[in-house]
Amino acid sequence: SGGMMGIPSSSESIAPLVSAETARRIDNEEPFEWKIGGDVSVGKLVRQQFGDDVVDHVVSALLGGVYSCTADDLGLRATIPALAASLDKLAADGPVKLSDAVRAMEQARPRTPGKGAPFQTFRGGYAEVYEALAEKSGADIHLDSFISGVTRESEGFRVKGAPNEAGLYDRVLFATPAPTTARLLPALSPAASAVLKKVKLAGSVVVGFKFDSDTDPNGNRLPDNTGILVGTDQTDVHAKAFTLSSRKWPHLAERGGALVRASFGRFGDDALVRAEEDDLVDYALDDLQHITGFDGRAAGVSEIFTQRWFGGIPRYDETHLDTVAAAHAALADVPGIEATGAWSGGVGVPAVVADARG
Protein backbone atom coordinates (compact mmCIF):
# COMPACT_ATOMS: atom_id res chain seq x y z
CA SER A 1 0.00 0.00 0.00
CA GLY A 2 1.09 3.60 -0.45
CA GLY A 3 3.89 4.77 -2.69
CA MET A 4 3.71 5.64 -6.36
CA MET A 5 4.17 2.87 -8.97
CA GLY A 6 6.27 0.98 -6.44
CA ILE A 7 8.38 3.99 -5.42
CA PRO A 8 7.99 4.19 -1.62
CA SER A 9 7.83 7.08 0.82
CA SER A 10 9.33 4.81 3.48
CA SER A 11 10.62 1.26 3.67
CA GLU A 12 7.55 0.01 5.52
CA SER A 13 5.48 -0.89 2.46
CA ILE A 14 8.24 -2.79 0.63
CA ALA A 15 10.43 -4.09 3.46
CA PRO A 16 9.69 -7.77 2.66
CA LEU A 17 10.90 -7.22 -0.92
CA VAL A 18 14.25 -5.52 -0.28
CA SER A 19 17.33 -6.03 1.85
CA ALA A 20 17.70 -4.52 5.31
CA GLU A 21 20.45 -2.28 3.93
CA THR A 22 18.11 -0.97 1.23
CA ALA A 23 15.38 -0.36 3.81
CA ARG A 24 17.78 1.73 5.89
CA ARG A 25 18.84 3.65 2.78
CA ILE A 26 15.22 4.52 1.98
CA ASP A 27 14.51 5.72 5.51
CA ASN A 28 17.72 7.75 5.63
CA GLU A 29 17.60 9.12 2.10
CA GLU A 30 20.12 11.79 1.16
CA PRO A 31 18.75 14.98 -0.48
CA PHE A 32 19.70 15.68 -4.09
CA GLU A 33 19.50 18.53 -6.56
CA TRP A 34 16.49 18.36 -8.87
CA LYS A 35 16.28 20.59 -11.93
CA ILE A 36 12.79 22.06 -12.19
CA GLY A 37 11.32 20.97 -15.51
CA GLY A 38 14.05 18.39 -16.01
CA ASP A 39 13.63 14.71 -16.74
CA VAL A 40 15.39 11.43 -16.06
CA SER A 41 14.67 7.75 -16.42
CA VAL A 42 12.64 6.33 -13.55
CA GLY A 43 15.21 3.62 -13.03
CA LYS A 44 18.14 6.00 -12.82
CA LEU A 45 16.38 8.22 -10.29
CA VAL A 46 15.25 5.39 -8.02
CA ARG A 47 18.59 3.57 -8.21
CA GLN A 48 20.36 6.80 -7.31
CA GLN A 49 18.21 7.42 -4.23
CA PHE A 50 17.12 3.97 -3.04
CA GLY A 51 19.32 1.39 -4.77
CA ASP A 52 18.93 -1.47 -7.23
CA ASP A 53 16.65 -3.60 -5.05
CA VAL A 54 13.75 -1.18 -5.29
CA VAL A 55 14.03 -0.92 -9.08
CA ASP A 56 14.54 -4.60 -9.85
CA HIS A 57 12.17 -6.09 -7.26
CA VAL A 58 9.35 -3.56 -7.26
CA VAL A 59 9.30 -0.59 -9.65
CA SER A 60 10.22 -2.41 -12.87
CA ALA A 61 7.68 -5.11 -12.04
CA LEU A 62 4.87 -2.57 -11.69
CA LEU A 63 5.84 -0.42 -14.66
CA GLY A 64 6.64 -3.46 -16.80
CA GLY A 65 3.08 -4.69 -16.46
CA VAL A 66 1.85 -1.44 -18.00
CA TYR A 67 4.60 -0.41 -20.42
CA SER A 68 6.45 -3.66 -21.28
CA CYS A 69 9.66 -1.87 -20.31
CA THR A 70 11.94 -1.79 -17.30
CA ALA A 71 12.10 1.36 -15.20
CA ASP A 72 15.46 2.16 -16.81
CA ASP A 73 13.77 2.54 -20.21
CA LEU A 74 11.02 4.90 -19.03
CA GLY A 75 11.09 8.66 -18.52
CA LEU A 76 9.66 10.10 -15.32
CA ARG A 77 7.57 12.84 -16.95
CA ALA A 78 6.10 10.54 -19.58
CA THR A 79 5.09 7.79 -17.16
CA ILE A 80 4.72 9.32 -13.67
CA PRO A 81 4.14 13.03 -14.43
CA ALA A 82 2.57 13.73 -11.04
CA LEU A 83 5.78 12.66 -9.31
CA ALA A 84 7.85 14.91 -11.56
CA ALA A 85 5.51 17.79 -10.67
CA SER A 86 5.88 16.99 -6.97
CA LEU A 87 9.67 17.11 -7.29
CA ASP A 88 9.41 20.41 -9.18
CA LYS A 89 7.37 21.90 -6.36
CA LEU A 90 9.78 20.77 -3.65
CA ALA A 91 12.82 21.89 -5.65
CA ALA A 92 11.68 25.50 -5.43
CA ASP A 93 13.00 25.41 -1.85
CA GLY A 94 16.31 23.67 -2.59
CA PRO A 95 17.53 20.05 -2.56
CA VAL A 96 14.81 17.41 -2.46
CA LYS A 97 14.16 13.86 -1.35
CA LEU A 98 12.34 11.38 -3.55
CA SER A 99 10.57 9.98 -0.49
CA ASP A 100 9.25 13.46 0.37
CA ALA A 101 7.86 13.90 -3.14
CA VAL A 102 6.08 10.54 -2.94
CA ARG A 103 4.78 11.33 0.55
CA ALA A 104 3.34 14.63 -0.66
CA MET A 105 1.43 12.72 -3.32
CA GLU A 106 0.15 10.22 -0.77
CA GLN A 107 -1.11 13.01 1.44
CA ALA A 108 -2.90 14.64 -1.49
CA ARG A 109 -4.90 11.50 -2.29
CA PRO A 110 -8.58 11.40 -1.34
CA ARG A 111 -9.07 9.64 1.99
CA THR A 112 -12.59 8.41 1.26
CA PRO A 113 -12.51 4.64 0.82
CA GLY A 114 -13.86 3.51 -2.52
CA LYS A 115 -16.77 1.14 -2.89
CA GLY A 116 -17.34 -1.58 -5.44
CA ALA A 117 -14.87 -3.34 -7.67
CA PRO A 118 -11.50 -1.54 -8.13
CA PHE A 119 -11.50 -2.52 -11.82
CA GLN A 120 -14.27 -2.05 -14.32
CA THR A 121 -14.81 -3.19 -17.88
CA PHE A 122 -17.53 -4.14 -20.34
CA ARG A 123 -19.16 -7.52 -19.78
CA GLY A 124 -18.61 -8.45 -23.41
CA GLY A 125 -15.14 -6.92 -23.58
CA TYR A 126 -13.96 -3.92 -25.58
CA ALA A 127 -15.29 -5.53 -28.75
CA GLU A 128 -18.67 -4.12 -27.68
CA VAL A 129 -17.20 -0.61 -27.75
CA TYR A 130 -15.48 -1.02 -31.11
CA GLU A 131 -18.61 -2.39 -32.72
CA ALA A 132 -20.79 0.37 -31.29
CA LEU A 133 -18.37 3.09 -32.40
CA ALA A 134 -18.15 1.64 -35.89
CA GLU A 135 -21.93 1.54 -36.18
CA LYS A 136 -22.54 5.01 -34.74
CA SER A 137 -19.83 6.63 -36.86
CA GLY A 138 -21.65 5.97 -40.10
CA ALA A 139 -18.24 5.65 -41.76
CA ASP A 140 -17.26 3.37 -44.61
CA ILE A 141 -14.74 1.06 -42.97
CA HIS A 142 -12.31 -0.81 -45.22
CA LEU A 143 -10.63 -3.66 -43.37
CA ASP A 144 -7.38 -5.32 -44.44
CA SER A 145 -6.41 -2.41 -46.71
CA PHE A 146 -2.63 -2.10 -47.05
CA ILE A 147 -1.89 1.64 -46.95
CA SER A 148 1.50 2.55 -48.39
CA GLY A 149 1.40 6.34 -48.23
CA VAL A 150 -0.61 9.55 -48.37
CA THR A 151 -0.09 12.31 -50.93
CA ARG A 152 -1.61 15.74 -51.42
CA GLU A 153 -3.43 16.55 -54.65
CA SER A 154 -5.09 19.77 -55.73
CA GLU A 155 -8.48 18.89 -54.23
CA GLY A 156 -7.52 16.73 -51.27
CA PHE A 157 -5.46 13.80 -50.07
CA ARG A 158 -5.07 10.48 -51.80
CA VAL A 159 -4.56 7.44 -49.60
CA LYS A 160 -2.47 4.90 -51.48
CA GLY A 161 -3.93 1.45 -50.97
CA ALA A 162 -7.48 2.57 -50.21
CA PRO A 163 -10.23 1.18 -52.47
CA ASN A 164 -10.42 3.02 -55.80
CA GLU A 165 -13.96 4.21 -55.18
CA ALA A 166 -12.82 6.04 -52.05
CA GLY A 167 -11.47 8.95 -54.11
CA LEU A 168 -9.89 11.94 -52.37
CA TYR A 169 -10.18 12.88 -48.71
CA ASP A 170 -10.50 16.36 -47.21
CA ARG A 171 -8.65 15.36 -44.05
CA VAL A 172 -6.57 12.40 -42.89
CA LEU A 173 -6.12 11.23 -39.31
CA PHE A 174 -3.22 8.88 -38.64
CA ALA A 175 -4.06 6.59 -35.71
CA THR A 176 -1.12 4.27 -36.28
CA PRO A 177 2.04 3.39 -34.32
CA ALA A 178 4.77 6.02 -34.52
CA PRO A 179 7.08 4.10 -36.92
CA THR A 180 4.13 3.34 -39.21
CA THR A 181 3.06 6.98 -39.16
CA ALA A 182 6.65 7.96 -39.97
CA ARG A 183 6.64 5.69 -43.04
CA LEU A 184 3.35 7.17 -44.29
CA LEU A 185 4.23 10.84 -43.80
CA PRO A 186 7.36 11.67 -45.87
CA ALA A 187 5.44 13.21 -48.78
CA LEU A 188 3.41 15.41 -46.45
CA SER A 189 5.77 16.28 -43.61
CA PRO A 190 9.39 15.11 -43.85
CA ALA A 191 10.10 16.78 -40.51
CA ALA A 192 7.37 14.89 -38.63
CA SER A 193 8.39 11.67 -40.33
CA ALA A 194 12.01 12.08 -39.25
CA VAL A 195 11.02 12.79 -35.65
CA LEU A 196 8.63 9.85 -35.34
CA LYS A 197 11.25 7.42 -36.62
CA LYS A 198 13.00 7.91 -33.27
CA VAL A 199 10.18 6.27 -31.31
CA LYS A 200 11.05 2.69 -30.37
CA LEU A 201 8.46 0.01 -29.67
CA ALA A 202 8.12 -2.83 -27.17
CA GLY A 203 6.45 -6.13 -27.96
CA SER A 204 4.48 -8.46 -25.72
CA VAL A 205 2.54 -11.70 -25.80
CA VAL A 206 -0.16 -13.06 -23.52
CA VAL A 207 -1.26 -16.65 -23.05
CA GLY A 208 -4.74 -17.07 -21.63
CA PHE A 209 -5.94 -20.23 -19.87
CA LYS A 210 -9.27 -21.54 -18.74
CA PHE A 211 -8.69 -24.05 -15.96
CA ASP A 212 -11.39 -26.48 -14.93
CA SER A 213 -10.95 -25.40 -11.31
CA ASP A 214 -9.06 -22.81 -9.26
CA THR A 215 -7.84 -25.63 -7.01
CA ASP A 216 -5.58 -28.47 -8.12
CA PRO A 217 -6.00 -32.09 -6.89
CA ASN A 218 -3.47 -31.47 -4.09
CA GLY A 219 -5.51 -28.57 -2.71
CA ASN A 220 -3.30 -25.76 -4.03
CA ARG A 221 -5.53 -22.78 -4.92
CA LEU A 222 -4.90 -19.79 -7.11
CA PRO A 223 -4.25 -16.72 -4.94
CA ASP A 224 -7.21 -14.52 -4.02
CA ASN A 225 -5.54 -11.37 -5.37
CA THR A 226 -6.14 -10.02 -8.87
CA GLY A 227 -2.66 -10.53 -10.25
CA ILE A 228 1.01 -11.33 -9.78
CA LEU A 229 3.98 -9.19 -10.80
CA VAL A 230 7.45 -10.63 -11.31
CA GLY A 231 10.67 -8.76 -10.52
CA THR A 232 13.09 -8.31 -13.40
CA ASP A 233 15.84 -10.07 -11.45
CA GLN A 234 13.87 -13.33 -11.21
CA THR A 235 15.91 -15.18 -13.80
CA ASP A 236 14.18 -18.52 -13.13
CA VAL A 237 10.80 -17.11 -14.25
CA HIS A 238 9.92 -16.33 -17.87
CA ALA A 239 6.62 -14.49 -17.34
CA LYS A 240 6.59 -10.84 -16.30
CA ALA A 241 3.08 -10.96 -14.83
CA PHE A 242 -0.08 -12.99 -14.34
CA THR A 243 -3.60 -11.61 -14.37
CA LEU A 244 -6.03 -13.74 -12.37
CA SER A 245 -8.89 -12.69 -14.60
CA SER A 246 -11.68 -14.48 -12.75
CA ARG A 247 -10.63 -12.66 -9.57
CA LYS A 248 -10.13 -9.28 -11.24
CA TRP A 249 -13.38 -9.34 -13.24
CA PRO A 250 -16.13 -11.01 -11.16
CA HIS A 251 -18.43 -11.42 -14.16
CA LEU A 252 -15.85 -13.71 -15.77
CA ALA A 253 -16.05 -16.03 -12.77
CA GLU A 254 -19.68 -16.64 -13.70
CA ARG A 255 -18.45 -18.72 -16.65
CA GLY A 256 -17.11 -21.36 -14.29
CA GLY A 257 -13.58 -22.62 -13.91
CA ALA A 258 -10.72 -20.14 -13.54
CA LEU A 259 -9.36 -17.72 -16.15
CA VAL A 260 -5.68 -16.75 -15.93
CA ARG A 261 -3.54 -14.71 -18.31
CA ALA A 262 0.26 -14.91 -18.44
CA SER A 263 2.20 -11.98 -19.93
CA PHE A 264 5.66 -12.08 -21.52
CA GLY A 265 8.04 -9.64 -23.21
CA ARG A 266 9.89 -6.42 -22.46
CA PHE A 267 11.50 -3.72 -24.56
CA GLY A 268 14.74 -4.85 -26.16
CA ASP A 269 14.02 -8.56 -25.73
CA ASP A 270 11.58 -10.04 -28.25
CA ALA A 271 12.73 -13.65 -27.83
CA LEU A 272 9.66 -14.61 -25.81
CA VAL A 273 7.33 -12.65 -28.08
CA ARG A 274 8.59 -14.79 -30.98
CA ALA A 275 8.72 -18.07 -29.06
CA GLU A 276 6.70 -21.11 -30.14
CA GLU A 277 3.23 -21.28 -28.61
CA ASP A 278 3.90 -24.68 -27.02
CA ASP A 279 6.96 -23.25 -25.27
CA LEU A 280 5.02 -20.23 -24.01
CA VAL A 281 2.29 -22.49 -22.64
CA ASP A 282 4.86 -24.58 -20.78
CA TYR A 283 6.63 -21.49 -19.44
CA ALA A 284 3.35 -20.06 -18.19
CA LEU A 285 2.20 -23.24 -16.46
CA ASP A 286 5.63 -23.86 -14.94
CA ASP A 287 5.98 -20.27 -13.73
CA LEU A 288 2.49 -20.22 -12.24
CA GLN A 289 3.19 -23.39 -10.28
CA HIS A 290 6.63 -22.17 -9.21
CA ILE A 291 5.19 -18.91 -7.85
CA THR A 292 1.85 -20.04 -6.40
CA GLY A 293 2.05 -23.81 -6.01
CA PHE A 294 -1.05 -24.20 -8.20
CA ASP A 295 -0.61 -27.02 -10.74
CA GLY A 296 -2.62 -25.90 -13.74
CA ARG A 297 -1.99 -29.11 -15.67
CA ALA A 298 -3.41 -31.21 -12.86
CA ALA A 299 -6.33 -28.82 -12.36
CA GLY A 300 -7.24 -29.31 -16.01
CA VAL A 301 -6.77 -26.94 -18.95
CA SER A 302 -9.89 -26.64 -21.09
CA GLU A 303 -8.94 -23.64 -23.26
CA ILE A 304 -5.75 -21.83 -24.33
CA PHE A 305 -5.49 -18.60 -26.31
CA THR A 306 -2.33 -16.77 -27.40
CA GLN A 307 -2.16 -13.15 -28.55
CA ARG A 308 1.02 -11.41 -29.72
CA TRP A 309 1.69 -7.71 -30.19
CA PHE A 310 4.86 -7.03 -32.18
CA GLY A 311 5.76 -3.45 -31.36
CA GLY A 312 2.49 -2.92 -29.57
CA ILE A 313 3.52 -0.11 -27.24
CA PRO A 314 5.96 2.83 -27.46
CA ARG A 315 8.95 3.18 -25.20
CA TYR A 316 8.18 6.31 -23.19
CA ASP A 317 11.76 7.30 -22.39
CA GLU A 318 13.00 10.63 -21.05
CA THR A 319 13.09 12.14 -24.55
CA HIS A 320 9.63 10.95 -25.55
CA LEU A 321 7.63 14.05 -24.64
CA ASP A 322 10.01 16.27 -26.62
CA THR A 323 9.66 13.90 -29.58
CA VAL A 324 5.86 14.09 -29.42
CA ALA A 325 5.91 17.89 -29.18
CA ALA A 326 8.25 18.15 -32.17
CA ALA A 327 6.08 15.81 -34.26
CA HIS A 328 2.90 17.76 -33.55
CA ALA A 329 4.66 21.06 -34.20
CA ALA A 330 5.72 19.79 -37.62
CA LEU A 331 2.23 18.50 -38.41
CA ALA A 332 0.70 21.84 -37.45
CA ASP A 333 2.20 23.19 -40.69
CA VAL A 334 0.21 20.66 -42.75
CA PRO A 335 -3.49 21.64 -42.75
CA GLY A 336 -5.83 18.66 -42.95
CA ILE A 337 -3.43 16.18 -41.36
CA GLU A 338 -3.66 15.00 -37.74
CA ALA A 339 -2.02 12.17 -35.81
CA THR A 340 -2.91 10.43 -32.58
CA GLY A 341 -2.31 7.16 -30.78
CA ALA A 342 -0.57 5.74 -27.73
CA TRP A 343 2.74 7.33 -28.82
CA SER A 344 1.07 10.75 -28.65
CA GLY A 345 -1.18 10.72 -25.59
CA GLY A 346 0.07 7.90 -23.44
CA VAL A 347 -0.80 4.30 -22.72
CA GLY A 348 -4.34 3.13 -22.01
CA VAL A 349 -7.78 3.83 -23.41
CA PRO A 350 -8.50 7.00 -21.34
CA ALA A 351 -5.20 8.61 -22.40
CA VAL A 352 -5.69 7.76 -26.07
CA VAL A 353 -9.27 9.03 -26.07
CA ALA A 354 -8.26 12.27 -24.33
CA ASP A 355 -5.47 12.86 -26.86
CA ALA A 356 -7.79 12.19 -29.80
CA ARG A 357 -10.35 14.64 -28.43
CA GLY A 358 -7.67 17.26 -27.89
Report the location of each language-model feature.
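A structural signal for the hydrophobic beta-strands that form the central parallel beta-sheet
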Residues: I141-L143, F174, A339
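A short alpha-helix-loop-beta-strand transition element characteristic
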Residues: S1, D53-H57, L201, N218-L222, ...
